Amino acid sequence: MDLAKHIEDSIEWGGLEVSKLNQDILNIHGITSNKVRCFLNNICSIGGTYLEIGVFRGATFCSAIYGNDVYAIGIDNFASPNLMPMGVSQKLAAYLKQRLDVPPQEDFLNNVKRFGNTEQIDVYKGDYTTFDYTQLPKLDIVFYDGDTRFHDQYVTLKKIIPQFSERTILIMDDWNWNSGAIDQIIEEEGLVVTHRREVYTNGEDMESYWNGLGIFVIES
């Protein structure tokens, strides 16, 4: 498959909010936008093994797996129950927290059971910076939605990359705040990047690709 074309098509259709997603999935609370959700649903339509770092309540995880034949893996410590967008006012934050009495871990598991095939899903609770990724199979699609700090991204990606398949799509969320970690790793490891697509936004934009995406096809 031409992964570069698949990425560009997924971005185009995601921008139009065209995917297999229904309104119930779009209603899952998450710090993201509908365009990102639709993009993930489209990108995962090719199947394979999908890893998501930082699943929170399952907005992007459920979007990625819904209607797709993927083996999906999620990792999160579920330690931030009141996670909110960086730039919201106190008034908007209070509004966003309405009807969020269910803790993130419980909410995530409920959403996964509702919208996914639990026989094709594994969820690990823990620190993604110290997780033993060698226990995982080779990864075809990776969505990093963890901390945007250089250290967290660098340490985590260094651990994940050895588990990449022959061709892996790496998606970095919050690309507006690119720390430079992936670029340093690409240089250090001599990684072969056959396609690179950067999507920038005005920042935390519900009508666009939220806070940007960095998308890479990395070949071994």
Please provide the spans of the model-predicted regions:
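N-terminal auxiliary segments of SAM/dcSAM-dependent transferases
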Residues: 1-2
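S-adenosylmethionine/decaboxylated-SAM
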Residues: 6, 10, 23-26, 37-220
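Class I SAM-dependent transferase core
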Residues: 12-31
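N-terminal pre-P-loop "Q-motif" helix
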Residues: 32-36
